[in-house]
Regions:
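Extracellular/periplasmic, surface-exposed regions of secreted and cell-surface proteins
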Residues: 690-692
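Accessory carbohydrate-recognition regions in carbohydrate-active enzymes
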Residues: 21-366, 370-414, 420-477, 485-511, ...
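Extracellular attachment/recognition segments
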Residues: 710
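Bacterial N-terminal signal peptides that target proteins for export
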Residues: 1-8
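ATP-dependent phospho-/nucleotidyl transfer catalytic cores
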Residues: 482
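Bacterial N-terminal signal peptides
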Residues: 8-17
Length: 768
């Protein structure tokens, strides 16, 4: 029987059928978007929010794959697709046919296989490639398990390498930037002729990451040769060390595909076995693939777009797909998980979240998930509280459930305030509120790449002095915003004294604004300004770097909670708007010996490719000139996003770049968190519906096109609506209809009156 032809025919039928059903959201997803340039997207097989991201690894890339790299070195079970931190790529499998006798042959990360993108196919939950060895490799996944199907040429020796040494070569530890992904200990056991199990414990972007696996094979293993440190260890069935690999050879019917099902766990090998038993019960690869595809289609169907022929429809659903990879599950079916103290606990929730890239995701990705999947956000709130109980502070940036101190700020605060104001309950809100206050007042959080993290100097000086800490301006601005979010939580819970205190801290951003230059700039501990000053300057993590991954041009507008207060510093609306206009027209040149590589997607000095400015296009609403933002938002949507491998202008960053697109294309964006408010931008689809637990939001944009990007008028549930912002409860408290009339010229009257503007911190009180 020619198994290869049968499997290939089934795969071809799937490929054709999947993309023929163009009305289904999952059929619109183009997962190769962002796999080139700086997108750091990996074409993984994964379930929504799944722990397993099973996919190909190419040479020396941050996330594991780059479209331009010609070699595949294997298929690992863990990735962080979208970058924003370099790690994972654990438990790699690689099919081979020739006899393996040498160190060179047993190390696929030194050999690899060429491939062609013409032989590559991916859809939600499935990846397929024909390697130049003529082996067809197919991958699918459930939440906690991966499934492989390898079809070898007729008559070939069917072998598989398992590599526990392989990891992310660009992963540095949090302690020293010269140390790469290091295996602390790994183990592999040949249990019987159908089973292999083991684990890999490593230091990388986060310390002491535990990955356990339990693998079962459809074909009998007739030999399992173990390898450690340049030598085969013949005659042994288990091996422990830091350079462990195995070469498996299969018996059974010649030419028959080898199907592998693999459970993954952060807890134990038995946890991996239980995950496998719960999620994959047979050997039907196509059934698992179909089920995961169905799960993705159901998840993506939360948003339905009526525009049948819109080219942006594929970008939208791909972006929503990327956004719904996170927060990443990190608990077993038993509820057990490994926390930041490396101990195992059991939680009362379905999902313990193991990847929290909060510096990125607090802006739009987490608020988007709170709208579409409040159940996931509820478990995320429980995750935050569990993390606090085990390590004494709320997460800053976690990977594999472990804190790594990456980036700045304490951005659990916006997540909590956003979830609570949206009515998401089912967790101990008062305990979480106490955790917010404790976390925001720690003198020392820890260190990242030898750089200090903490609020000691911030509290002492009411700004972070540039002679005492790097990225001092960015830290100050983000601490102020996070403190504002704490104040919102205090207001909602009725804590007046706390509200007054944190509102006061939220105004400390004013201490770094130079009114002579109209820029935020670094200030020394003696109160003097850092000199010389260059608003185009970036010197990534060097001693004179006052701005995290950006310039003063980009960071001066990071006061999302107090637009009016910021305008007052500029001297009023007109100079503020003039400066904001200039942001998009000045030179895109970046000065400095080591400019931050993340400053990408530039329009003037506006950088769409990095997160600090994602709200900036909406700051025109504070000034009563929303039409200026409408045009620029439309330009970004149409020029900086497409479905090509280069279609994301920066790292997707745990889905934040994608979530910005999703929210913005709906016509509104969460500039602030904790007030339940969205700033109106510009919609791009004629009609879409958003399904949420309380009903359906219908969004219509009559006459919309790229040219017709200007709002002429708005109605909410049939009534005229002139405000340039919206309340969450009006959109998502039940069924609602938001309708736009669009045109080619701006209506400068709509959304421009003082009563139509969003509230700023300087005008808010405890009561309102």
């Amino acid at each position: 029987m020619n198994y290869r032809k049968i499997v290939s025919a089934v795969a071809l039928l799937w490929c054709t059928a999947g993309f023929a059903a163009g009305s289904e959201p999952a059929a619109c997803v183009r997962p190769m978007m962002g796999t080139g340039a700086a997108g750091c997207v990996v074409p993984v097989a994964a379930a929504p929010f799944g722990m397993v991201q099973l996919g190909p690894d190419t040479y020396f890339t941050a996330s594991g794959y780059h479209y331009d790299h010609p070699l595949i070195y294997g298929f690992s079970h863990t990735h962080k697709s979208g970058g924003g931190g370099t790690d994972y790529q654990d438990i790699m499998f690689f099919p081979v046919m020739d006899a393996v006798w040498t160190q060179q042959q047993v190390c696929p990360d030194r050999v690899g296989s060429r491939y062609s993108h013409e032989q590559e196919f991916i859809e939600p939950g499935y990846y397929r490639i024909r390697l130049d060895s003529d082996v067809d490799a197919e991958l699918t996944a459930t939440a906690r398990c991966g499934m492989h199907r390898y079809t070898y040429p007729e008559g070939a020796m069917r072998q598989l390498i398992i590599d526990l040494k392989h990891g992310c070569e660009h992963s540095t530890t949090i302690f020293a930037d010269e140390d790469f992904d290091t295996v602390k200990i790994s183990r592999l056991e040949w249990v019987d002729d159908r089973t292999v199990r083991g684990y890999r414990v490593s230091n990388g972007w986060a310390p002491e990451q535990h990955v356990y696996f339990y693998a079962e094979f459809s074909e009998p293993i007739v030999s399992c040769r173990l390898f450690d440190h340049k030598h085969f260890r013949d005659g042994v069935r288990e091996l422990e060390g830091t350079d462990v690999r195995a070469v498996l050879r299969f018996g059974g019917k010649a030419g028959k595909p080898v199907v592998v099902r693999v459970g993954i766990s952060p807890v134990s090998m038995d946890g991996a076995r239980q995950n496998l038993r719960a999620e994959i019960k047979g050997w039907n690869f196509d059934k698992v693939r179909k089920t995961t595809y169905r799960d993705w289609n159901e998840a993506l169907s939360a948003v339905r777009i009526a525009d049948a022929d819109s080219p942006q429809k594929e970008v939208f659903y791909t972006s929503l797909y990327f956004a719904m990879l996170y927060p990443m599950l990190y608990s077993d079916v038993t509820g057990e998980y490994r926390s930041s103290d490396s101990k195992v606990y059991k939680g009362d929730f379905r999902y313990f979240a193991g990847v929290l890239g909060l510096w990125d995701t607090f802006r739009a990705q987490n608020p988007l998930i709170a709208i579409l999947r409040p159940d996931v956000t509820r478990d995320l709130m429980k995750t935050l509280l569990e993390h606090y109980r085990h390590c004494g502070q709320l997460p800053i940036w976690t990977l594999a459930g472990v804190e790594n101190m990456c980036m700045i700020g304490y951005h659990s605060m916006p997540l909590v305030a956003d979830a609570y104001c949206k009515g998401i309950r089912g967790y101990d809100a008062e305990a979480l509120y106490e955790a917010m206050k404790a976390s925001a007042n720690r003198d020392t959080f820890g260190y990242f790449l030898k750089a200090f993290r903490g609020t000691r100097y911030y509290k002492q000086y009411e700004y972070v002095p540039c002679d005492l800490e790097v990225t001092s301006v960015s830290k100050t601005l983000e601490y102020c915003y996070d403190d504002w979010c704490i104040a919102q939580m205090a207001r909602m819970l009725g804590h007046r004294d706390d509200y007054d205190y944190y509102i006061g801290r939220a105004g400390w951003y004013k201490n770094l604004f130079d009114q002579n230059l109209n820029f935020m700039r670094g200030r020394n501990s003696d109160g003097s300004w850092r000199t010389p000053f260059d608003p185009f300057h970036s010197n990534h993590y060097r001693p004179d770097d006052d701005f995290c991954e950006g310039t003063s041009w980009q960071w001066t507008f990071f006061v999302p909670h107090d637009g009016k207060g910021l305008m007052n510093l500029f001297g009023g609306r007109d100079p503020f708007v003039a400066k904001l206009d200039s942001l998009f027209t000045v030179s895109s040149e970046i000065h400095g010996d080591n400019p931050a590589p993340d400053i990408t997607g530039l329009i003037g000095q506006y950088a769409q490719g990095n997160e600090p400015g994602h709200h900036t296009l909406y700051m025109y609403n504070y000034a009563g000139q929303p039409w200026k933002g409408q045009k620029r938002i439309s330009d970004v949507i149409y020029t900086l996003y497409d479905t090509s491998p280069e279609g994301i202008c920066g790292n997707d960053d745990t889905g934040q770049m994608s979530a910005w697109y999703v929210m913005s294309s709906m016509g509104f964006y969460p500039v602030t968190h904790g007030r339940g408010v969205y700033f109106i931008g510009t919609p791009i689809f004629g009609e879409m519906s958003v399904k949420h637990p309380n009903g359906v939001l219908t969004i219509r944009a009559n006459g919309v096109s790229r040219e017709n990007c200007y709002i002429q008028s708005v109605t909410l549930n049939g009534a005229p609506y002139s405000k340039n912002w919206l309340r969450h409860e009006d959109l998502f408290g039940g069924n609602a209809t938001l309708a736009f009339e669009m045109g080619p010229e701006p209506n400068k009257n709509w959304g421009s009156s003082p009563e139509d503007l969003p509230q700023s911190m300087c005008d808010e009180t405890f009561e309102n």
